[in-house]
Regions:
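Bacterial N-terminal signal peptides that target proteins for export
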Residues: 5-30
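Bacterial N-terminal signal peptides
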Residues: 29-39
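Compositionally biased, proline/threonine/alanine/serine-rich low-complexity intrinsically disordered stretches
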Residues: 43-86, 95
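Gly/Pro-enriched, hydrophobic low-complexity segments
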Residues: 52, 222-309
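N-terminal mature ectodomain segment of secretory-pathway/periplasmic proteins
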Residues: 75-179
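Flexible, processing/modification-adjacent segments and terminal tails
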Residues: 76-91, 97-100, 168-235, 255, ...
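Well-ordered beta-strand positions enriched in small/hydrophobic/aromatic, beta-favoring residues
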Residues: 118, 151-153, 171, 211, ...
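Short, ordered beta-strand-loop transition motifs
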Residues: 144-147, 215-223, 270-271
């Protein structure tokens, strides 16, 4: 059974709240407990005031309230009110914070995911409608921007084994230690997985991409923020971000008149960062790819020679 959007209580996160969480996430519960305890003790031991003292105190309180009336800060805006006027940046940054484990956000992702080694299973349906099964292994060397990353995807089919490599914005293949030029459709599919993937959102600032927030949309009872991310090559990806969890549940992009939709399921945490363990890709409402992560680790040393041609 495919996992749908997990409806956990969540809300839009402001930059001010991020600072408060990081600075006072330990002290705040203690402070609240002290305030509650103080209030309880005070309630149990009420002070007895004389009529004259009570009137004098009321006058002093009224005078103090008038003096400070102009300096009282505006009321705190609730999460529901923020959600009504959410900006593209607020939605994007809130989602990044969730994927980074709620505390570090972008900083945590950069620290933990310096490298990634992923293993799993994949099924691919070709243009003739034939589905092939394979195991895969993926190595990623993180860089300042998505375009500068180094990625190697090794595919092991029953009758063939080869690798596709993304390095210096170029794509080439390796078969039996020999470099080759992959078919155009295979190279394009590999590239789309990179430029139209989750990292396009999580690293929109580093990539200098433009973001635009559209109207919210409800699909099968689940409400989404629709966030468009367009990179410097004018490649646009629309992300459907849950208004409850701020997880990306699916994304859309178009190419050569075809509409592609990638859905994400089975979210779980790996080394404190959020990862979808099941991904399904549709092309014109037909499933053409399904991948399932078996194991993923971050931060391990990778020999950069594997990203070279031979």
């Amino acid at each position: 059974m495919l996992q749908s959007d997990i409806r956990k209580p969540s809300r839009l996160i402001t930059k001010g709240e991020i600072d408060l969480i990081s600075r006072f996430n330990i002290l705040t519960p203690l402070a609240i407990a002290v305030l509650i305890l103080t209030h309880a003790v005070g309630a149990q031991q009420p002070a007895i005031q004389k009529p004259a003292e009570k009137k004098a105190e009321e006058k002093a309180t009224e005078s103090a309230q008038k003096k400070t009336e102009k300096s009282v800060p505006p009321p705190v805006v609730t999460s529901k009110e923020i959600a009504k006027t959410a900006t593209a940046e607020q939605v994007a940054e809130s989602s990044i914070l969730v994927y980074g484990g709620l505390i570090g956000g972008r900083q945590t992702l950069n620290q933990i995911r310096k490298t990634a080694i992923e293993k799993g299973k994949i099924s691919v349906t070709n243009a003739e409608g034939k589905t092939e099964q394979a195991t895969y292994q993926r190595w990623t060397q993180r860089a300042e921007t998505l375009a500068k990353e180094k990625i190697r995807l090794e595919l092991d089919f029953p009758n063939a084994r080869y690798s596709l490599i993304f390095n210096a914005e170029k794509i080439f293949g390796i078969h039996e230690d020999q470099a080759f030029t992959p078919r155009e459709d295979a190279a394009r599919s590999f590239e789309n997985n990179i430029v139209h993937g989750l990292e396009a959102l999580l690293r929109y600032k580093e990539n200098e991409s433009k973001i635009e927030l559209g109207a919210k949309e409800k699909i099968l009872g689940v409400e989404y923020y629709l966030l468009d991310v367009t990179d410097k090559q004018a490649r646009k990806t629309r992300f459907y971000i849950s208004t409850k969890t701020f997880r990306v549940m699916m994304l859309d992009y178009q190419e050569d008149g075809r509409k592609f939709r990638r859905r994400f399921y089975d979210y779980n945490y790996a080394q404190g960062t959020l990862v979808p363990y099941l991904t399904i890709l549709w092309a014109d409402e037909k499933i053409i790819e399904q991948s399932e992560v078996g194991n993923i680790t971050f931060g391990q040393k990778i020999d950069e020679a594997i990203f070279n041609a031979g």
